């Protein structure tokens, strides 16, 4: 089965078993991500609970920056572990417990108290996610062969998106427009994270030798790596694919399409795009991840330019025009997600993957905060100005991607 998934046979039976465990556990975590999306699900829940707007506005920064910036502090710990899978297992289990805490807060509390409790649990979830992120690339690199990693992560993304599509359709139908069913979905997310931790714990990982070098040495190596610095620049420009979707929704709303304000619209666009593209992007990334980054940047820029043209023509709010633009943008976004992971795993030295991932992700966390703030400033003039800025970033990032080292050639 693993050979059919990856397109080439595993090096040994253990790699085949590990590949299937990666797909299963990663699929469960991606389902959880969709069920507890702070941009949509948690924002809706806090609105329903009567939490203040400033608390709701803190959800996305807590989740995004909290999952990236701490990684540089966690990487040294990971690289001192003989079996790095246990960091991922612990992170997934803690995310599960945090999600269950969010569901409990939504059931028992209201108003400001509910908002603060959910934000606190989300902060714990984000920190645990940072632990998973900084350890996963290292574990993937040690347990799955170089030409098969993108297929594993891509299939997980496509498989998980099926469940999220169903959830989105239920949201859009109005069947889940009550607090109770949404809390059940968040509880299910917690159980999926716990299940993923149990499955990942069975991974057959060869212990690594204990390290005796300075804890800061791997980070100094990473910071001096010109290839990594260029990658951070490219990935930093391509964060525009993650930041732009809410501004597309603003363009549609200003055009008169109230349907896009429903909770399920963005969830459906993202999940459908992930289902149709993640596995394909993953397989293409195994061949050339820098090419996928370039194509994704160009596609994102094109989608955003189309949005500007449609907005200027006054038809952005007509029918399903905006969801179609969002779908195209999310196709590009998932291409960036697949390719950035594969490039870093293939490029980083075997003994320093966690450090490389931590340096890159911490830098991206800071760039996300800065770019998000810049987008907010530009949108105060007009949402279209922010969209134009993100289109320029995506185009520049896509162009610079072709100057990256061909990680798969090595």
What do these predicted regions represent?
Residues 93-111, 298-316:
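C-terminal ends and interior cores of transmembrane alpha-helices
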Residues 22, 114-122, 230-231, 317-326:
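Short hydrophobic/alpha-helical segments at membrane-entry points of transmembrane helices
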Residues 79-94, 286-300:
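Cytoplasmic membrane-interface "Motif A"-like loop-to-helix N-cap segments
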Residues 21-40, 59-76, 91-95, 121-178, ...:
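Substrate-agnostic recognition of the 12-TM MFS/MFS-like secondary transporter fold
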Residues 2-69, 227-266:
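Helix-loop boundary and gating motifs at the non-cytosolic
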Residues 56, 87, 152, 182-188, ...:
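Alpha-helical transmembrane segments of multi-pass secondary-active solute transporters
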Residues 48-49, 80-81, 139-143, 251-256, ...:
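Helix-to-coil boundary motifs at intracellular loop junctions of multi-pass secondary transporters
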Residues 197-213, 402-410:
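Helix-loop junctions on the cytosolic side of multi-pass membrane transporters
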């Amino acid at each position: 089965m693993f050979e059919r998934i990856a397109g080439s046979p595993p090096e040994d039976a253990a790699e085949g078993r590990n590949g299937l465990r990666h797909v299963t556990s990663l699929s469960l975590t991606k389902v959880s991500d969709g069920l507890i999306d702070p941009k949509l699900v948690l924002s809706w829940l806090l609105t329903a609970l009567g939490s203040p707007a400033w608390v709701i506005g803190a959800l996305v920064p807590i989740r995004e920056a909290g999952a990236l910036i701490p990684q540089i502090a966690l990487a040294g710990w990971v690289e001192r572990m003989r079996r790095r899978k246990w960091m991922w297992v612990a992170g997934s289990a803690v995310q599960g417990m945090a999600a269950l805490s969010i569901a409990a807060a939504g059931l028992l509390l209201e108003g400001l108290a509910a908002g603060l409790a959910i934000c606190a649990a989300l902060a714990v979830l984000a920190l645990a996610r940072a632990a998973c992120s900084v350890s996963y690339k290292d574990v993937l690199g040690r347990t799955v062969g170089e030409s098969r990693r993108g297929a594993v992560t891509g299939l997980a993304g496509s498989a998980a998106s099926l469940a999220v599509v169903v959830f989105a359709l239920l949201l859009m139908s109005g069947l889940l427009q009550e607090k109770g069913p949404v809390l059940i979905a968040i509880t299910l997310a917690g159980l999926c994270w716990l299940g993923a931790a149990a499955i990942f714990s069975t991974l057959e990982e060869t212990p690594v030798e204990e390290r005796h070098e300075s804890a800061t040495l791997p980070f100094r190596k990473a910071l001096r790596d010109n290839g990594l610095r260029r990658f951070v620049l490219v990935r930093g420009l391509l964060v525009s694919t993650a930041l732009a979707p809410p501004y597309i929704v603003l363009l549609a709303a200003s055009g008169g399409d109230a349907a896009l304000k429903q909770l399920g619209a963005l969830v459906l666009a993202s999940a459908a795009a992930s289902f149709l593209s993640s596995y394909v992007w993953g397989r293409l990334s195994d061949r050339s991840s820098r090419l996928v980054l370039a194509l994704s940047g160009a596609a994102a820029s094109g989608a955003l330019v189309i949005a500007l043209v449609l907005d200027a023509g006054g038809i952005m709010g007509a029918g399903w025009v905006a969801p179609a633009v969002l779908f195209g943008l999310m196709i590009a976004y998932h291409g960036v997600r697949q390719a950035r992971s594969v490039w870093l795993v293939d490029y980083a030295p075997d003994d320093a993957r966690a450090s490389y991932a931590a340096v890159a992700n911490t830098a991206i966390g800071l760039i996300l905060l800065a770019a998000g703030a810049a987008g907010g400033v530009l949108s105060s003039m007009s949402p279209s100005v922010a969209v134009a800025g993100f289109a320029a970033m995506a185009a520049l990032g896509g162009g610079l991607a072709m100057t990256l080292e061909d990680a798969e050639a090595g």
